[in-house]
From Swiss-Prot:
This is Pyrrolidone-carboxylate peptidase. Its EC number is 3.4.19.3. It comes from Yersinia pseudotuberculosis serotype O:1b (strain IP 31758). InterPro entries: Peptidase_C15, Peptidase_C15-like, Peptidase_C15-like_sf, PGP-I_bact-type, PGPEP1_Cys_AS, PGPEP1_Glu_AS. Belongs to the peptidase C15 family.
Amino acid sequence: MRRVLITGFEPFGGERINPSWEVVKQMNDLMMGGVRIVARQLPCAFGEALTALNTAIDDVQPVLVLAIGQAGGRADITIERVAINVDDARIPDNLGNQPVDQPIIQEGPAAYFTRLPIKAMVQGIREAGIPASVSQTAGTYVCNHVMYGLLHRLNQFNNEVKGGFIHIPYLPEQAVDHPGAPSMSAQSVLVALELAISIALQIEHDLHITGGPVH
């Protein structure tokens, strides 16, 4: 049976919950068109997150890996285009580490592009009435760290496996502690992630449509 690995993070930065795990854990053991979804939680910690991710990939042997993370302040489901080879942490991770201008992989390439049909995914999610867009930066915190490490692994050892990263907004119960911050319901995020998986499994060549910002 084919499997999809989807990951979410533990809470960080003083939050009580992390929306990525709150939604992703609901997808564990879900069957979609003969494909089994396996959900795993990652620690919000440099190095440790990649160790946990690589262990999960070894255990699950997925055909697709989707890493999901919180992007408080964003209003859309944002599908990341690129990961860069640098850790530059504005705040410490959950183990107290705060790397500044450190490469994720020594002698690794400057960046990796996603292995997902991101524009087709955005289009499909929007057609379901859920805000979505292509993002040009995954930041330089643990989310980018995981995306870069994932794509490095897939490019080096699992070239047939698709993979990438999706950022999601705060849940409403988080946004009440951040006046003015946008949020999205867990149900809408769940629908968006199910669509993302379905489209990623079906589409081999991405749509040739615009998705970039002006600035």
